[in-house]
Design a protein with these regions (language model features):
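Mid-sequence helix-capping/hinge segment at a functional interface
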Residues: 1-42, 46
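A short acidic, often aromatic-flanked loop/helix-cap motif at beta-alpha or helix-coil junctions
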Residues: 10-12, 96-99, 153-158
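Nucleotide-sugar donor-binding patch of glycosyltransferase catalytic domains
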Residues: 90, 118-183
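Short, basic/glycine-rich phosphate-binding loops at helix/coil junctions
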Residues: 1-2, 30-33, 78, 152-158
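Short, glycine/serine-rich, charged loops/turns that create anion-binding
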Residues: 37-38, 71, 134-135
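Donor-binding and catalytic core of enzymes assembling or modifying cell-surface/extracellular glycoconjugates
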Residues: 45-132
């Protein structure tokens, strides 16, 4: 029988090194946050992410690693320059090979539908993935590590390319499912 659950392995020594380098502590909630995506219709607003991170940090002492590439630096800077920025570390200047052990040292990921969500899932993180303009039935249901959010009025089956639902992702649903993820 074929197991569709992907699994990515990371060297334990590399994970231990990044835990020391980035002061990743077990008593904190450590998240990978991926606020970017391949296009603007697949991105939940950066201000929503800022508000979400603030709320999560009120509930649990948290550290947020903001994943993205060079093209995402302005987006990430908005988060770093916000009131929650002191709890955030940008990964935009790192290669995927450098980011993977950092991801493996974390427990949770909250992402738009992007490659970082799938890497986090493969590393065994509990993931909340926001699908707003792509089909979660194709890209999100393969993994037990992925919890899915779709726009209000859509379902896992109906959400797809051209849904253009980024403004219909409900903040309360994302917050509630984020809190459920860590419990």
């Amino acid at each position: 029988e074929l197991n569709p659950q992907s699994k990515i392995y990371c060297n334990k020594n590399e994970i231990d090194e990044v835990k020391i380098k980035f002061n990743i502590k077990a008593e904190e909630k450590n998240y990978i946050i991926a606020p970017s995506a391949s296009g603007p219709t697949k991105r939940w607003g950066v201000n929503n992410y800022i508000k979400l991170l603030e709320e999560l940090n009120k509930t649990y002492s948290s550290k947020f690693f903001i994943a993205g590439g060079k093209d995402d630096e302005t987006l990430i800077k908005n988060i770093i320059d916000s009131s929650i920025g002191k709890n955030c570390i940008s990964l935009s200047n790192k290669s995927v090979a450098e980011i993977i052990p950092i991801m493996a040292a974390c427990n949770y990921a909250i992402c738009n539908d992007t490659g970082f969500a799938h890497l986090a899932s493969g590393l065994g993180l509990k993931c909340l993935v926001l699908f707003m303009d792509s089909p979660p039935i194709a890209y999100g249901t393969y993994s037990k590590n992925i919890s899915i959010i779709v726009p209000e009025g859509e379902s896992i089956e109906s959400c797809g390319h051209n849904t253009k639902g980024k403004d219909k992702i409900l903040f309360k649903e994302v917050l509630d499912k984020s809190l459920k993820l860590v419990n």
